[in-house]
A protein has these predicted regions:
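ATP-binding/phosphotransfer module of carbohydrate and carboxylate kinases, centering on a glycine-rich
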Residues: 1-10, 28, 50-56, 102-268
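Phosphate-binding/catalytic loop of phosphoryl-transfer enzymes
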Residues: 13-119, 265-267
Length: 268
């Protein structure tokens, strides 16, 4: 606040987007900002509000985990996925990385096609062979985040033309489209048009993932279209606060948010 030339009593609203502890956070923030109305939502809500600039739609999140979440014009909400790696996370970076490891196992066993993923998997896991991978995993030296990190190498090999890597991303795209389609059908049962915004690190894979995702989405939810998010989740929290204050979302407001978005991007 000091760096912005503000004091706590000048803040009239604060929006929060949290994974957990939503209700517990409110009194903490209110103690710091006594004049503010504090609005706390789940992080998927502020992610969607930012991505769609406050409009209805669906976000499709694919990072270490995966989930689809949507809000329609009536304010109704629905989600699909988000069950963690044991029960779900299909189409996530973890799922892609795990599939890459399994593909390498099959290739070396002679049960699957050869793939350029083999040296990539061993390099990423810092293991010379499958026996070492096995030992490292069961001794707790390979974390889920490490497996998810393999998705970057899968994307690179898919871009280079490796069939196995391309198929892994195509299967991930089908799973992600299935989640988004399920949400779209529940919130827009009459087949109205809906925008789906892809969010999360896996989408840095680019066209090898986005192309099959568009095709799969067209098959499962023909009225859905894929668009890039307009604002990041942190600005979704700002929009959450503005909406609670009934501030009109004018072009000037969006220009200010756009400038903030660019400043945030420059910090990364």
């Amino acid at each position: 606040l000091a760096s912005a030339g503000l004091t706590a009593d000048t803040i009239v609203a604060a929006g929060l987007g949290l994974t957990g502890g939503r209700h517990e956070a409110i009194p903490v923030v209110q103690s710091l900002l006594p004049a503010a109305e504090v609005i706390s939502e789940g992080d998927v809500v502020t992610c969607l509000i930012g991505a769609r600039a406050g409009r209805p739609g669906v976000i499709l999140i694919a990072g270490t985990g995966s989930v689809a979440f949507g809000i329609n014009a009536a304010g109704q909400r629905a989600d699909a996925g988000g069950w963690g790696y044991f029960l779900g996370d299909q189409g996530s970076a973890y799922d892609v990385g795990h599939a890459a490891i399994q593909a390498v196992v099959k290739a070396l066993d002679g049960r699957g096609p050869q793939t350029t993923l083999s040296p990539e998997v061993f390099a990423h896991l810092e293991a010379p062979d499958l026996k070492t991978v096995y030992d490292h995993y069961h001794s707790g030296r390979i974390a889920r985040a490490t497996i998810a990190g393999l998705a970057v190498r899968v994307a690179a090999q898919a871009e280079q033309g490796d069939y196995v890597a391309q198929q892994i991303l195509a299967r991930a795209a089908e799973e992600l489209a299935s989640m988004a389609g399920a949400v779209a059908r529940r919130l827009w049962p009459d087949g109205e048009s809906v925008v789906v915004c892809p969010v999360g690190g896996l989408f840095r894979a680019g066209q090898p993932l986005l192309d099959p995702l568009r095709a799969a989405l067209s098959a499962t939810a023909p009225a859905a279209s894929l668009e890039q998010p307009r604002f990041p989740p942190v600005l979704g929290a700002v929009l959450l606060a503005l909406k609670r204050l009934a501030v009109p979302l004018t072009d000037a407001v969006f220009e200010t948010l756009g400038a903030a978005r660019d400043e945030i991007a420059a910090l990364k």
